[in-house]
Amino acid sequence: MSNKVLLSTLCALAVCCLPADSRPRTSPPNDAAFLSMAAQADMTIAHIGQMAENRAATDKVKNFAKTVVQDHTNDYWELTGVASKAGDQIPKAINSQNERMITALERSKGKAFDRDFLTRQSAEHERLISAFKQEAEYGTNPVIKDYARKALPTIERHLHDAQDLLKQRS
């Protein structure tokens, strides 16, 4: 056996024999992408919710916004712990795509703001429900799967509330 093959084999065996906690840990690409997407959603939804707390035309929308801010802020911090347990990190700043969406919403005023905010919340929470269900079912990291499963009821409630408020406007 050549020295290179022997050395490669020994290195591979050494890595396999490391205690589990000392091996480099990262989530598989799909789990890592889910963590990043969820963090972006939490930060963006909380930011838009804060805007709505101040700018919404009705108290019902302001109250919904307050709930969304609290829930998604808490969720972001929970997600930070989940990512840490999974050996990953999550973004700490809103990306440029979400910044553009925030900027577009900032142009709305009054009842148009309420409509645009609720429409955005409905669309975003529908997207999140789909992603969280997929992660809960097909994710590979049990910690991340469990997080997705536990977070779903809150996301579904937000969607239901946003849709109800949109219907009340009609």
Stretches with model-predicted labels:
Residues S2-S8, C17-S170:
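His/Met- and acidic-residue-enriched segments that coordinate or traffic transition-metal cofactors
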